[in-house]
Protein backbone atom coordinates (compact mmCIF):
# COMPACT_ATOMS: atom_id res chain seq x y z
CA UNK A 1 0.00 0.00 0.00
CA UNK A 2 1.27 3.48 -0.82
CA UNK A 3 0.00 7.05 -0.97
CA UNK A 4 -0.46 8.31 -4.52
CA UNK A 5 -0.14 12.08 -4.53
CA UNK A 6 -1.72 12.48 -7.98
CA UNK A 7 -4.80 10.37 -7.11
CA UNK A 8 -4.88 11.69 -3.52
CA UNK A 9 -5.55 8.19 -2.20
CA UNK A 10 -3.90 5.07 -0.87
CA UNK A 11 -3.27 2.55 -3.62
CA UNK A 12 -2.18 -1.07 -3.87
CA UNK A 13 0.86 -2.93 -5.10
CA UNK A 14 0.49 -6.06 -7.21
CA UNK A 15 2.48 -8.37 -9.46
CA UNK A 16 1.90 -7.83 -13.18
CA UNK A 17 2.00 -10.37 -16.02
CA UNK A 18 5.82 -10.04 -16.13
CA UNK A 19 6.01 -10.88 -12.40
CA UNK A 20 7.16 -7.36 -11.56
CA UNK A 21 5.81 -5.31 -8.68
CA UNK A 22 3.64 -2.43 -9.88
CA UNK A 23 1.47 0.17 -8.15
CA UNK A 24 -2.20 0.26 -9.10
CA UNK A 25 -4.95 2.62 -8.02
CA UNK A 26 -8.46 1.27 -7.77
CA UNK A 27 -10.26 3.46 -5.25
CA UNK A 28 -12.16 1.29 -2.82
CA UNK A 29 -11.74 -0.45 0.50
CA UNK A 30 -7.97 -0.71 -0.06
CA UNK A 31 -7.86 3.10 -0.18
CA UNK A 32 -9.47 3.51 3.22
CA UNK A 33 -7.74 0.71 5.19
CA UNK A 34 -5.31 3.11 6.93
CA UNK A 35 -8.38 5.01 8.15
CA UNK A 36 -10.30 1.83 9.07
CA UNK A 37 -7.43 0.43 11.12
CA UNK A 38 -6.80 3.64 13.03
CA UNK A 39 -3.39 4.14 11.43
CA UNK A 40 -4.52 7.46 9.98
CA UNK A 41 -4.92 9.75 12.96
CA UNK A 42 -7.24 12.75 13.28
CA UNK A 43 -4.34 15.11 12.57
CA UNK A 44 -3.14 13.36 9.41
CA UNK A 45 -2.85 15.64 6.36
CA UNK A 46 -4.34 12.76 4.31
CA UNK A 47 -7.49 12.35 6.39
CA UNK A 48 -9.51 14.97 4.46
CA UNK A 49 -8.83 13.20 1.14
CA UNK A 50 -9.90 9.85 2.62
CA UNK A 51 -13.08 11.34 4.09
CA UNK A 52 -13.85 13.02 0.75
CA UNK A 53 -13.49 9.65 -1.01
CA UNK A 54 -15.83 7.98 1.49
CA UNK A 55 -18.42 10.76 1.27
CA UNK A 56 -18.49 11.19 -2.54
CA UNK A 57 -21.56 9.47 -4.10
CA UNK A 58 -19.66 9.06 -7.37
CA UNK A 59 -16.93 7.18 -5.50
CA UNK A 60 -17.74 5.07 -2.39
CA UNK A 61 -20.82 6.64 -0.77
CA UNK A 62 -24.23 5.07 -1.47
CA UNK A 63 -27.68 5.14 0.11
CA UNK A 64 -26.99 1.68 1.54
CA UNK A 65 -23.39 1.96 2.75
CA UNK A 66 -19.83 2.36 1.58
CA UNK A 67 -19.10 0.54 -1.71
CA UNK A 68 -16.15 -1.84 -1.95
CA UNK A 69 -15.02 -0.20 -5.20
CA UNK A 70 -15.51 3.28 -6.59
CA UNK A 71 -18.48 3.76 -8.88
CA UNK A 72 -16.04 5.51 -11.26
CA UNK A 73 -13.70 2.50 -11.55
CA UNK A 74 -13.74 0.63 -14.86
CA UNK A 75 -14.16 -2.66 -12.96
CA UNK A 76 -17.14 -1.48 -10.91
CA UNK A 77 -20.03 -3.97 -11.07
CA UNK A 78 -18.41 -6.08 -13.80
CA UNK A 79 -17.96 -9.82 -14.30
CA UNK A 80 -17.36 -11.59 -11.01
CA UNK A 81 -18.03 -8.59 -8.82
CA UNK A 82 -17.45 -10.05 -5.35
CA UNK A 83 -15.07 -7.16 -4.52
CA UNK A 84 -16.25 -4.84 -7.28
CA UNK A 85 -19.23 -3.04 -5.77
CA UNK A 86 -20.92 -4.94 -2.95
CA UNK A 87 -21.27 -3.32 0.44
CA UNK A 88 -19.71 -5.18 3.38
CA UNK A 89 -21.24 -4.62 6.81
CA UNK A 90 -17.97 -5.24 8.67
CA UNK A 91 -16.19 -2.52 6.67
CA UNK A 92 -19.10 -0.13 7.17
CA UNK A 93 -18.91 -0.75 10.92
CA UNK A 94 -15.21 0.21 10.86
CA UNK A 95 -16.04 3.35 8.86
CA UNK A 96 -18.61 4.42 11.47
CA UNK A 97 -16.30 3.58 14.37
CA UNK A 98 -13.43 5.58 12.91
CA UNK A 99 -15.64 8.50 11.85
CA UNK A 100 -16.58 8.78 15.50
CA UNK A 101 -12.93 8.64 16.58
CA UNK A 102 -11.76 11.12 13.93
CA UNK A 103 -14.57 13.54 14.72
CA UNK A 104 -12.57 14.74 17.71
CA UNK A 105 -10.98 17.25 17.59
CA UNK A 106 -9.71 18.42 14.20
CA UNK A 107 -12.34 17.15 11.74
CA UNK A 108 -15.24 17.61 14.12
CA UNK A 109 -17.80 19.22 11.81
CA UNK A 110 -16.78 17.45 8.59
CA UNK A 111 -16.65 13.93 10.07
CA UNK A 112 -19.89 14.44 11.99
CA UNK A 113 -21.57 15.62 8.77
CA UNK A 114 -20.86 12.30 7.06
Please name every model-derived segment.
Residues 33-43, 93-108:
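Well-ordered alpha-helical scaffold segments within catalytic/enzyme domains
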Residues 1-87:
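Extended glycan-interaction surfaces of carbohydrate-active proteins
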Residues 109-114:
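Beta-strand segments within the central parallel beta-sheet cores of soluble alpha/beta enzyme folds
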Amino acid sequence: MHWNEKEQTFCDATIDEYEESVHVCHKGYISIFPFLTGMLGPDSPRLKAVLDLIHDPQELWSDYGIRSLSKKDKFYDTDENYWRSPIWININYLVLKNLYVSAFPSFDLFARGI
